[in-house]
């Protein structure tokens, strides 16, 4: 392929560069170090090392530029810094993301008016809040006996800790006040506790937020068999004789299209673009794009009572500082929402000029609700209309059921109760964010125990009836969840990557054995 920056053939082609795609690269680098790997990302590299969280960029102007560069076809549109700033009827994306231009709602449906995506190396992990709670109760996938070990592996890859904000002023106080109204009757694992976060501290005590760079790790970056190609749009997965055979990729710099052969293909985009690519490739299992689910989100704010300024250091470009803390109210089947309680540096609503805010005393509360899963909730594709990348246009069909509305009503009452327990509410009533605001879209390439038409892939994430093709990302999660899905999605990616590594290693051993027999 003269003039191409891409290899003619690799062992594994990975589409996407978010946490799950990066988990495949990491596990393969660790467990199949001889395998050649090519990773393709449609967006540009916006941080250093590639995939790093933009919050780690200290210069505000450079950070803003990285966010704009991640917004793909939506670059230049007006954004909002927090989901709670989106008022009813307004469609604005958060920095680093962009919204669907059309097809996000249809008459008689709720739709997903603020469904968003990112196009950059690292995907949304360059912009996320880094919350990594473990699933509980019916959030857990019942047919994976090794799920707990896989979650441990995901913790390792993401660099998860519950100690990032140890010693933050008022964080103990917030948890104590929440626990007083939450913990009764709950098992220890489901009581109020610090939020597990993918973040660590430098030697100078500064915060470093995990992005895909942390998931990849040095073992991937130093792997001579691994290559990352940015500004590269994969337009088709190639299938020969029913088996994955490679990808067709368009170089966004030159416009030229190239074929890269591969023994395995991993499609690790988001829950909207992964099924889009499979559809465009003619790979269309019955469940593809179906069981789409978002987490309805309710937000509220309170102010801590009886606290004084402790004069800590200011924030460095994020909503969290040394005065901050993040408390977690875990999901339970009895209370089917996940609580994320963050101490903020500023009030989300105006306060009196003579009433200065004590840093860390403003508490933002959010409850995420598990969806009532429906087969009819789906992202469909229109072959007659193309999106900004020339791919089949997305058409989202999505409704909140009666049960969803009942859970939302419960969540609204609960968040007010929690807000009053913490302090003085800053607003009269909670605000329900528009569908899509959670950014936690799942189910569109869902995993299943058997090929029964209700799932897209096996417990190893291999697409049914297409050997060698694997899917990754939040879309693989088959259960209704309220907790942040990244940890679970990375755990599932670890399982799939190990399946590929095992097969590659087995094939290598067989080849070496055959060579010895010939000699």
Swiss-Prot record:
FAD-dependent C-glycoside-metabolizing enzyme that participates in the degradation of certain C-glycosides by catalyzing the oxidation of the hydroxyl group at the C3 position of the sugar moiety. Shows oxidase activity toward various C-glycosides such as isovitexin, isoorientin and mangiferin but cannot use carminic acid, puerarin, orientin or aloesin. Shows weak activity (100 to 1000-fold lower) with O-glycosides. Probably plays a crucial role in the metabolism of C-glycosides in nature. Pfam families: GMC_oxred_C, GMC_oxred_N. It is an enzyme of class 1 (oxidoreductase). InterPro entries: FAD/NAD-bd_sf, GMC_OxRdtase_N, GMC_OxRtase_C, P2Ox-like. Its cofactor is FAD. GO terms for molecular function: flavin adenine dinucleotide binding; oxidoreductase activity, acting on CH-OH group of donors. Binds 1 FAD per subunit. Keywords: FAD, Flavoprotein, Oxidoreductase. It comes from the Bacteria. Its EC number is 1.1.3.50. This is C-glycoside 3-oxidase. Monomer. PANTHER family: PYRANOSE 2-OXIDASE. The active site is at 440 (proton acceptor). FAD binds at residues 41, 118, 120, 124, 129, 131, 234, 474, 486. Residues 43-93 are annotated as: Disordered. It catalyses: isovitexin + O2 = 3''-dehydroisovitexin + H2O2; isoorientin + O2 = 3''-dehydroisoorientin + H2O2; mangiferin + O2 = 3'-dehydromangiferin + H2O2. Residues 55-64 have a biased composition (Basic and acidic residues). Belongs to the GMC oxidoreductase family.
């Amino acid at each position: 392929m003269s003039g191409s920056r891409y290899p003619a053939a690799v062992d594994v082609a990975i589409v996407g560069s978010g946490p799950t795609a990066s988990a495949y690269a990491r596990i393969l680098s660790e467990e199949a170090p001889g395998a050649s790997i090519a990773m393709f990302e449609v967006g540009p590299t916006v941080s250093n090392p590639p995939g790093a969280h933009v919050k780690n960029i200290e210069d505000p102007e450079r950070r803003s530029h990285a966010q704009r560069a991640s917004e793909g076809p939506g670059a230049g549109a007006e954004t909002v810094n927090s989901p709670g700033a989106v008022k009813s009827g307004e469609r604005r994306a958060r920095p680093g993301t962009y919204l669907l231009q059309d097809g996000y709602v249809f008459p008689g449906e709720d739709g997903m008016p603020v469904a968003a995506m990112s196009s950059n190396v690292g995907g949304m992990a360059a912009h996320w809040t880094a919350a990594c709670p473990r699933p509980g109760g019916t959030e857990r996938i019942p047919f994976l006996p090794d799920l707990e070990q896989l979650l441990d592996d995901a913790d390792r890859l993401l660099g998860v800790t519950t100690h990032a904000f140890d010693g933050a002023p008022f964080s103990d106080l917030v948890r104590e006040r929440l626990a007083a109204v939450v913990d009764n009757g709950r098992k220890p694992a489901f009581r109020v506790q610090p939020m597990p976060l993918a973040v660590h501290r430098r030697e100078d005590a500064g915060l470093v937020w995990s992005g895909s760079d942390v998931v990849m790790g040095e073992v991937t970056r130093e792997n001579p068999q691994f290559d990352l190609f940015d500004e590269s749009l994969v337009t088709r997965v190639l299938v020969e004789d029913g088996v994955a055979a490679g990808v067709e990729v368009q170089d966004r710099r030159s416009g030229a299209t190239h074929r890269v052969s591969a023994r395995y293909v991993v499609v690790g985009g988001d829950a909207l673009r992964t099924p889009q690519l499979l559809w465009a490739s003619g790979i269309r299992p019955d469940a593809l794009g179906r069981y789409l689910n978002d987490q309805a989100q309710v937000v509220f704010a309170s102010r801590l009572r009886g606290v004084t300024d402790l004069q800590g250091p200011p924030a460095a470009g994020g909503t969290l500082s040394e005065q901050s803390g993040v408390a977690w109210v875990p999901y339970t089947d009895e209370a089917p929402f996940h609580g994320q309680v963050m101490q903020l540096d500023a009030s989300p609503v105006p306060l009196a000029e003579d009433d200065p805010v004590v840093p860390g005393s403003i508490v933002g509360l959010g409850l995420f609700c598990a969806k009532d899963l429906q087969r009819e909730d789906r992202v469909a594709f229109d072959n007659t209309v193309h999106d900004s990348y020339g791919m089949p246009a997305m058409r989202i069909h999505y409704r909140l059921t009666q049960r969803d509305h009942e859970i939302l009503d419960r969540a609204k009452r609960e968040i007010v109760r929690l807000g009053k327990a913490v302090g003085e509410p800053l607003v009269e009533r909670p605000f329900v964010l528009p569908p899509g605001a959670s950014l936690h879209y799942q189910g569109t390439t869902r995993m299943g125990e058997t090929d029964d038409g209700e799932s897209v892939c096996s417990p190893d994430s291999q697409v049914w009836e297409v050997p060698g093709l694997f899917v990754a990302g939040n879309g693989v999660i088959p259960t209704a969840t309220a907790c942040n899905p990244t940890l679970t999605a990375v755990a599932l990616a670890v399982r799939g990557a190990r399946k590929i590594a095992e097969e590659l290693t087995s094939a290598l051993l067989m080849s070496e054995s055959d060579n010895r027999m010939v000699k």
